[in-house]
């Protein structure tokens, strides 16, 4: 693999979800890719386990601005002589205050936007099964009114407060932002134009699809593949698992085998309602999953 003319020291920042998901996989893959290309990678990671009662009571404030994050990231930047900070998820325990550490240390910062959360607290522009753009058009308070974040008005207030506060600080206007698709980029530019005050700097918004490491297992010739389809991802409404299970119910006993790989809140419902043509594997190691995909006819991801 070609090496860079001048390797850099890159700090990757990510707050892991309680249930492993795509953002976690992208974070790990990007870390490996940068290292493979000769860069020195440092990571700053947390999870969303708030700990004891005192920590849970302080979490709403720390989710908005974490002095711990600022202090630790500044120290890490100085100690490791970091050239660039690349942020993935900051919700909840890292907080966007990580960027203040970058600003204070005069280190460039970039964030990959895996969702629309800077305009929509639930991140997906959906409510009650329909497209919803109320927050981009009428303000973040709409999410609080509809309890959009985790079905909780209190948690929605915290989430909306995070982005409202950092709009006031102008945090995202100083950060380079990456979207995963041109559609995402166009929607964010549209929302930014309609905002009473720009949330980010348009010239700092770029599109870079997620990279994927070359699989160890090449796909088998079509004739040699098993009559099966793989559903891989977090088992939740957003990923379309309910639709897939209902489709397999309609297809009947002649349907190809659907192999569901992953865990999530919809798992119990799916197992209860799945026909015999659906099997569940739980969370699979990456190598096992790629081998399974290589011998299957299609994937639902």
Regions found by a protein language model. Give the residues of each.
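Glycosyltransferase donor-sugar binding loop
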Residues: 47-48, 232-235, 257-270, 274
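Acidic donor-binding loop of glycosyltransferase active sites
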Residues: 294-301
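Short N-terminal targeting/anchoring amphipathic segment
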Residues: 12, 74-94, 108-117
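Donor nucleotide-sugar binding/catalytic pocket of nucleotide-sugar-dependent glycosyltransferases
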Residues: 118, 133, 137-217, 280-281
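Conserved active-site histidine-acidic residue motif and adjacent donor-binding/catalytic loop
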Residues: 67, 264-267, 278-293
């Amino acid at each position: 693999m070609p090496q860079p003319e001048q390797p850099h020291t890159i700090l990757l920042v990510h707050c892991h979800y309680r249930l492993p998901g795509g953002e976690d996989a992208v974070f790990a893959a990007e870390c490996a890719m940068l290292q493979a290309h000769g860069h020195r990678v440092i990571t700053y990671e947390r999870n969303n386990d708030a700990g004891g009662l005192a920590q849970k009571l302080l979490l709403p404030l720390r989710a908005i601005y974490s002095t711990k994050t600022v202090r630790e990231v500044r120290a890490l930047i100085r100690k490791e002589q970091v050239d660039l900070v690349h942020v993935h998820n900051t919700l909840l325990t890292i907080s966007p205050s990580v960027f203040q550490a970058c600003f204070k240390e005069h280190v460039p910062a970039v964030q990959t936007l895996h969702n629309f959360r800077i305009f929509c607290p639930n991140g997906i522009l959906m409510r009650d099964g329909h497209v919803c753009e109320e927050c981009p058009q009428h303000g973040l308070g709409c999410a609080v009114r509809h309890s959009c974040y985790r079905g909780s008005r209190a948690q929605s207030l915290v989430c909306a407060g995070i982005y409202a506060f950092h709009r006031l600080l102008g945090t995202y206007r100083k950060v380079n932002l990456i979207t995963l698709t041109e559609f995402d980029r166009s929607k964010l530019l549209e929302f930014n134009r309609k905002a009473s005050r720009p949330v980010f700097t348009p010239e700092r918004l770029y599109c870079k699809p997620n990279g994927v490491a070359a699989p160890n297992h090449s796909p088998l010739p079509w004739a040699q593949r098993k009559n099966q389809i793989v559903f891989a991802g977090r088992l939740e409404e957003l990923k379309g698992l309910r639709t897939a299970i209902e489709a397999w119910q309609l297809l009947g006993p002649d349907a190809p085998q659907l192999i569901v790989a992953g865990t999530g809140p919809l798992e119990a419902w799916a197992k209860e309602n799945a026909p015999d043509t659906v099997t569940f594997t739980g969370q699979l190691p990456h190598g096992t999953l790629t081998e399974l995909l290589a011998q299957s006819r299609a994937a639902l991801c």
